[in-house]
Curated annotation (Swiss-Prot):
It comes from Methylococcus capsulatus (strain ATCC 33009 / NCIMB 11132 / Bath). SUPFAM superfamilies: Radical SAM enzymes. Keywords: 2Fe-2S, 4Fe-4S, Biotin biosynthesis, Iron, Iron-sulfur, Metal-binding, S-adenosyl-L-methionine, Transferase. Pathway: Cofactor biosynthesis; biotin biosynthesis; biotin from 7,8-diaminononanoate: step 2/2. Homodimer. This is Biotin synthase.
Length: 326
């Protein structure tokens, strides 16, 4: 490796303090975005955005009590329980996503943790989607060591398991799964040799200090997640957070920018809540270092901007869809 190559390698820190993160959030908005965009340009093409598609392969009746989630069996939200989709239907959806330009296909199942029989069905889905030439991601709750190894054997590229919020605010959002449970599953995914997709949700009534704490939890993992989805709360009638005050859009953009600074080599993804974002807000997020989106009409059980709207926005901003492997 040459000295120039060493100089261009990202400096990945895992020792961020609360004070440092809060100081970044407190920067003047223009200064924060300038720093984030400068770091972004060192490691990524600033006009390229990776596109993923997400399909709910098993919907509703989840035993967890996540306060934001319309799929929880604890709340009356109108989401109907649906069994695990067939392999044929999943592959048909993956093919459509591929034709629309998605390079990664993510499959979400509303479980606390998958049963072994269901895991075998998911493994077959992973193998089928891989055969289409797409990257694969699964989110299905907590995993055992053996389950993580089985998904790796099937060819799974990414496993999603979010921290959701800061460790200090976590108990306000969920009581049926501990913060440590989440860390344990992330370690099992790493030990099995898969990439990690891990982020959180903002706008759940947390403080700015909690948003800083969420990013510290992510950046101080033994390895930074390769993908960091930043979700804006989708307020769903029937959930405990349905009446939560809307987050200031600039606070969301700040969260994206600080995520970019603290995790310079990770893909920062705009995830749930984009249907509530203006084009101008999304443009600021891209300027702040977001370089991945979920693409398509729906995100699990919530609305997502239609593909045509995304194409128009990309054209207006001069953005390109990234190729496979980005």
């Amino acid at each position: 490796m040459t000295n120039q190559e060493r100089a261009e390698e990202p400096v990945l820190r895992h020792d961020w303090t609360q004070g440092e993160a809060e100081a970044l959030f407190a920067l003047p908005f223009n200064e924060l975005l300038f720093q984030a965009q400068t770091i972004h340009r060192r490691h990524f093409d600033p006009n390229e955005v990776q596109v993923s598609s997400l399909l709910s392969i098993k919907t509703g009746a989840c035993s967890e009590d996540c306060a934001y989630c319309p799929q929880s069996a604890h709340y009356e939200t109108g989401v109907k329980r649906e069994s695990l989709m067939s392999l044929e239907d999943v592959l048909e959806a993956a093919q459509r996503a591929r034709e629309e330009g998605a390079t990664r296909f993510c499959m979400g199942a509303a479980w606390r943790s998958p049963r072994d029989g269901d895991l075998e069905a998911i493994a077959a889905m992973v193998e089928g989607v891989k055969a289409l030439g797409m990257e694969t991601c699964v989110t299905a709750g907590m995993l055992s060591d053996e389950q993580a190894r089985r998904l790796k054997e099937a060819g799974l590229d990414y496993y999603n398991h979010n921290l959701d919020t800061s460790e200090s605010y976590y108990g306000e959002i969920i009581t049926t799964r501990t913060y440590q449970d989440r860390l344990d599953t992330l370690q099992r995914v790493r030990d099995a040799g898969m990439h990690v997709c891990c982020g959180g949700i903002v706008g759940m009534g947390e403080s700015a200090a909690d948003r800083a704490g969420l990013l510290i939890g992510l950046a101080n993992l033994p390895r930074h997640p390769e993908s960091v989805p930043i979700n804006l709360l989708v307020r769903v009638e029937g959930t405990p957070l349905a009446d939560t005050a809307a987050l200031d859009p600039f606070d969301f953009v700040r969260t994206v920018a600080v995520a970019r600074i603290m995790m310079p080599a990770s893909r920062v993804r705009l995830s749930a809540g984009r249907s509530d974002m203006s084009d101008e807000m999304q443009a600021l997020c891209f300027l702040a270092g977001a370089n991945s989106i979920f693409y398509g009409d729906r995100l699990l059980t919530t609305e997502n901007p239609q593909a045509q709207r995304d194409r128009r926005l990309f054209a207006r901003l001069g953005l390109r869809m990234a190729g496979l492997g980005c």
